[in-house]
């Protein structure tokens, strides 16, 4: 297959590139800073020569978007919004100009589109979508993606949870704070954490490509969300950390100022279930949190 990954130089893109290349596929990366032969320049805003790479592509995956791991002041909020909307808009324009369009287009979204929920399990069908900055970003992103219907292209929005891997994302940071004795619960610890092992993330993307009946919205998350308190306890156990200091909300607020991030990333309860993956027969290699982190710690 010929696979194009827009914004593919980050944690998820690197792992997808490795996964699909090892399976014998041609993978090309659209990036602002091309360094390798398979990397193609684009600015994620305007049509350029990169458009030609979409011709006869089997798969287009768009992961473009400024990281949400920052303070939500007006400049950052605008960049978070525009980086997602503009890239989706220009890809649609490029796809429309293709004579032989990609067969499937997967666009990043986020499991944070669902409301803070400790009890209600959010599925694609019965998930409750709320109204704040993060949720509205996701809603606008998906609306832009699905705005134009191309009958010959299968579109899938990936509502992805926290992805756990050793070479990026949240897991290396969680390991570090736990080893430093700071691996207690954050806030009340009741907030649910939806997560997925990086291997299952890549496998799920491959599975969606192969299953032509899958389109629309899909939750990319493991079937076993855990509370923040449980997550940190299991991490302490596997890392043999004798204790872990808890962090109250006020402490997290102060720390987030110094770290230039938002407490929402730790305190929001993301209680999400991959109903469509499960119902359609996808098999997780790591359905449980403990087995997932054991594998990562042994890797």
What do these predicted ranges mean?
Residues 3-23:
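N-terminal Rossmann NAD(P)H-binding glycine-rich loop of SDR-like oxidoreductase domains
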Residues 129-133, 161-168, 188-198, 209:
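Glycine-rich "substrate-gating" loop/helix at the edge of Rossmann-like oxidoreductase active sites
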Residues 242-243, 263-299:
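C-terminal amphipathic/interface module of NAD(P)-dependent oxidoreductases
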Residues 208-259, 294-297:
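Mid/C-terminal beta-alpha module of Rossmann-like enzyme folds, strongest
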Residues 40-87:
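NAD(P)H-binding glycine-rich loop region in Rossmannoid oxidoreductase-like domains
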Residues 143-166:
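Conserved beta-loop-beta element that borders a ligand/cofactor-binding pocket
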Residues 175-184, 191-225:
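Alpha-helical substrate-binding/gating segment
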Residues 89-131:
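Conserved Rossmann-fold NAD(P)-dependent oxidoreductase catalytic core, especially the SDR/UDP-sugar
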